[in-house]
Amino acid sequence: MKKLIILIFLVPFFGLSQQLFWYDVFFEVEGGNSNSVSKLVNDFYSTVDKPSDLSIAFSRIPLKGENFKSTHMLSMFSPSSMSLANFRNSLKGEKWDLYTSGMRGKINSIRAVAGNVLSHVNLDKVGPIGQAWIFKVHAKDNVKFIAAFSKLMKTFKPNGFVAAGQLTHGSSDGESMVIYATASNLNEAFAGGGPKNKKEADAMQTFFEEIDFAEFSQTFTRVQIMNY
C-alpha cells in the first residue's frame, strides 16, 4: 500500500533563484473538523514571527489517489535553507504547545516531508491550484531527470508555474522526484495544460523517452486556503 505524502509548494515571488527549499506537513483531518483545523492553523500562523524570505501556505487536497489519505497540507518554503531551518526550529513555546494540543483529536495522522526545487519556469504565474506528479527515480539518475525537464521547458510553454524537484527527507516507497504545475482556476486545471502544437508534443515525447528510467507513482492536487 502506497503511503505517498509529498511536498506541494505554493511558491511565492522570490525572484529568479532556481532553487527553493520546502518543509511540508500533511494532515488527515477527521470528518467535520475541517473548519476547526483551519481556524487553529490561521490563528497560529497568522501571528507567528517568520523571516521575510519565507512563506507559509495552507491548502486542502481534494483530488488524489485512493491510498492518499491526507486531506490538508501546510507548506513552508524559502530560497534559503537557513531561513527555513531557523523558522522550523523556532516553533516551540507556549503558543506552539496550545496550537499542537488543539490539533490533537481533530486529525487522524500527520506526516512531514522536505525537499527542494531544482528547476522552474514562470515564477510570476503561480496559481492557487497545483498538481504534483510523483516519480520513483534512483539517486544516480536525479541529475538526468532534472536535465530532461530543463530541456523540455525550453520548448514547452506552460500557462502557469511549473517546477521539478527532489524529496530529500521523509519520502517513502522509493518516491524521489516531483513535477509540479499550477493553474489559475479550476477550468485551467481540468484542461490539463498539455502540448499546444506539434513542436511541444514532440518535446514532450522526447522528455518521456529521456526519463524512461523513472517510474510514475501518483498524482494529487491541492487548492490553497490561506497564505502567510
Region locations from a protein language model:
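Generic cytosolic/nucleocytoplasmic N-terminal low-complexity/intrinsically disordered segments
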Residues: 1-2, 197
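Short S/T/G/P-rich N-terminal loop/turn motif that feeds into the first structured element of a domain
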Residues: 17-228
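Sec-dependent N-terminal signal peptides
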Residues: 3-16
